[in-house]
Regions:
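Conserved glycosyltransferase catalytic-site signature
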Residues: 30-35, 55, 145-150
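Short, solvent-exposed loop/turn segments at secondary-structure junctions
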Residues: 55-59, 63-65, 82-83, 157-159, ...
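Extended C-terminal regions of large enzymes
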Residues: 193-204
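GT-A fold catalytic core of metal-dependent nucleotide-sugar glycosyltransferases
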Residues: 33-76
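Active-site-proximal specificity loops/subdomain of glycosyltransferases
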Residues: 1-42
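Conserved catalytic core of nucleotide-sugar-dependent glycosyltransferases
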Residues: 59-139
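Catalytic core and acceptor-binding pocket of nucleotide-sugar-dependent glycosyltransferases
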Residues: 102-191
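A general structural signal for short secondary-structure junctions and capping/turn motifs
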Residues: 39-43, 50, 142-144, 192-195
Length: 204
């Protein structure tokens, strides 16, 4: 990961779960992983980037063009949901984007198989820098609790606009996640797999 990070961020051997920073307090691994996604366009020339959670296990063939593209528009995972963590992430995104905190109410863009457009990532970073008056990285890592997916989603939906940014809202989740499913017994596990929908291609 160091290859795509700015030189003022480096591993801190003495701190297992944090990275050292010359410009900010220590940065958690989780925030660094998010920064790397936003930095990916520096190292990759593709127009579309697909982020797949490392815990995903594919159970069916996955054709990105068939599942993520519709009339040249790219799927943007979006469901309406209200949780305390989502409210916090939405408010942090609003701060970084210069948006009213209450706009984008109930939006959730977080998933385990997410696709972004390169040009939107670049535009998002530039917008954050204009709003924050500092580098987008420094503005981003100033927050311990933040979601890159919510930040990108709110930017796309509320600034250029979903269609103008080359996206369409997709309420289907391609990955059947275990976050909210008990997995303590064989019965729990069997129930988890029974709930997989025909359109889902992976489990997590």
């Amino acid at each position: 990961m160091e290859a795509v990070l700015p030189t003022w961020i480096r591993r801190a051997p003495e701190r297992k779960h944090d990275w050292a920073s010359d410009l900010t307090p220590p940065i958690t691994n989780g925030v660094i992983q998010q920064v790397v996604k936003l930095y990916a366009v520096n190292a990759i020339d593709e127009d579309i980037l697909i982020f797949c959670d490392s815990d995903n296990a594919f159970i069916r063939p996955f054709d990105p063009r068939a599942r993520l593209i519709r009339e040249d528009k790219l799927a943007l995972f979006y469901v309406e949901e209200d949780r305390p963590d989502l409210t916090l992430w939405r408010n942090v995104a609003a701060l970084l984007l210069g948006l009213p905190a209450q706009s984008g109410a109930r939006c959730n863009y977080v998933g385990n198989l997410i696709a972004w457009r390169r040009e939107n990532i670049i535009a998002l970073r530039r917008h954050v820098e204009r709003t924050a008056g500092t580098s987008w990285v420094r503005a981003f890592v100033a927050h311990l609790l933040i979601s890159e997916y919510v930040l990108y989603g709110r930017f796309v939906d509320e600034l250029p606009g979903t269609q103008a940014a080359g996206h369409f809202h997709a309420a289907y989740d391609l990955v059947h996640g275990s976050w909210n499913n008990p997995m303590a017994t064989e019965t729990d596990i069997a129930r988890f797999f029974d709930r997989i929908t025909p359109g889902q291609v992976a489990v997590m």
